[in-house]
């Protein structure tokens, strides 16, 4: 099961699964998921694609129900949305959608699938967090907040499942800025970070996928992101917030 599989990291994760012979159940809120599914089928695996909004319980239930009668060996929970700009200037419907996609829908799906895995006594879960969770996200406050939650949640869930001797592993992939549709959809194309050089989603996906197969607890993709998280752990939050604001403030990009 792969969420957010129509493009970016999720698409590349699904490709890796297909290359290894996994049959796929993929979902995205973008109609491009159907075209993506055709690409996955080129690897000779069975692919079932759904378009659904995982910000809603109905969307999550639709995806979960489609998996009934199948053994789910791995859940790759990658779906997520960003949102740039000052918090007070954002439409709260947009704010709520980011929270409901990145947090509520994600953990609702994980709970449902992980219960089945625990009952069966095996399974692998890969959750896409972010290095953004280490930094107060000035001008992307809600998004960074959701990723701080997801990073923390992933570590805690892994510890719970280990304590229960469940044989279900949880891996948190924490990428940095990646060359996807994220910044366009988040309205951050005019920012310094939106216009910066980004990581290749195929490279990011490979790091996370291999970590999942190896049962690793967490992995930061890319050397510069590893350095950033190390520095962030010893830097005052106020300093981090100021630094983030300089990169994410609307109009901060060099093309403006």
Residue ranges with predicted function:
Residues 20-35:
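Conserved glycine-rich Rossmann-like NAD(P)H-binding loop of the short-chain dehydrogenase/reductase
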Residues 172, 192-229:
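C-terminal helical subdomain
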Residues 110, 146:
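Active-site helix of classical SDR
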Residues 130:
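Residue(s) in the substrate-gating loop at a strand-loop-helix junction
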Residues 6-7:
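Conserved glycine-rich cofactor-binding loop
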Residues 86-87, 91-99:
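Substrate-binding pocket helix/loop in short-chain dehydrogenase/reductase
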Residues 78-83:
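Conserved NAD(P)H cofactor-binding loop of Rossmann-fold oxidoreductase domains
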């Amino acid at each position: 099961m792969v969420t957010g599989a129509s493009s970016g990291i999720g698409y590349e994760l699904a490709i890796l699964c297909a290359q290894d012979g996994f049959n796929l159940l993929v979902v995205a809120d973008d109609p491009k998921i159907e075209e993506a599914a055709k690409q996955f089928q080129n690897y000779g695996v069975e692919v079932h694609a759904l378009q659904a909004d995982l910000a809603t319980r109905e969307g999550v239930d639709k995806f979960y129900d489609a998996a009934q009668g199948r053994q789910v060996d791995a859940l790759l929970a990658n779906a997520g949305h960003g949102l740039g700009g000052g918090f007070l200037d954002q439409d709260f419907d947009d704010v709520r959608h980011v929270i409901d996609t990145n947090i509520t829908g994600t953990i609702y799906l994980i709970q449902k699938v992980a219960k089945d895995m625990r009952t069966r006594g095996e399974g692998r879960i890969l959750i896409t967090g972010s290095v953004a969770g280490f930094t107060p996200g000035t001008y992307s406050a809600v998004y960074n907040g959701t990723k701080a939650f997801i990073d923390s949640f992933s570590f805690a869930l892994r510890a719970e499942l280990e304590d229960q001797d469940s044989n279900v592993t949880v891996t948190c992939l924490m990428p940095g800025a990646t060359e996807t549709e994220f910044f366009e959809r988040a309205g951050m194309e005019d920012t310094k970070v939106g216009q910066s050089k980004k990581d290749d989603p195929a490279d990011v996906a490979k790091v996370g996928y291999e970590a999942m197969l190896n049962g690793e607890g967490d992995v930061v993709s890319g050397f510069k992101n590893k350095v950033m998280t190390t520095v962030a752990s010893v830097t005052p939050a106020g300093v981090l917030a100021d630094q983030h604001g300089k990169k994410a403030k609307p109009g901060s990009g060099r093309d403006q």
